[in-house]
From Swiss-Prot:
Gene3D superfamilies: Globins. The modification Phosphotyrosine is found at Y24. Keywords: Acetylation, Heme, Iron, Metal-binding, Oxygen transport, Phosphoprotein, Transport. Disulfide bonds: none annotated. Involved in oxygen transport from the lung to the various peripheral tissues. The modification N6-acetyllysine is found at K16. This is Hemoglobin subunit alpha. The lineage of its organism: Eukaryota, Metazoa, Chordata, Craniata, Vertebrata. O2 binds at H58. Residues 1-141 form the Globin domain. One of its GO terms (biological process) is hydrogen peroxide catabolic process. It comes from Panthera tigris sumatrae. Belongs to the globin family.
Amino acid sequence: VLSSADKNNVKACWGKIGSHAGEYGAEALERTFCSFPTTKTYFPHFDLSHGSAQVQTHGQKVADALTKAVAHINNLPNALSDLSDLHAYKLRVDPVNFKFLSHCLLVTLACHHPEEFTPAVHASLDKFFSAVSTVLTSKYR
């Protein structure tokens, strides 16, 4: 459960990301594909090379979804319902992949914002990404 401090930390951190959200989303995807090669199986039609336009575009989609989640942090299930349906019923993504991407998002954000990435912010973002992952996998049951 996200506390008020967690929500404030997430909103403050995401606010500092600003226009770099898509770039960081793509970087996190690249990290995920490199660190967890089985995740590539969901993107057989993508050019997964460094800096590819397809990875950049999908990274922006990830960032947009997270930006929406931050904006609706008090009602994640409603805000992410369509995305949950897509991943559960159409794409059938293995739920563990959300944990992999979450980890890579944390690494990416820590690399780009080391001063702001305090232990408290790290914990808050980890809880937030976990909450988002839980919502995205909630319709698998």
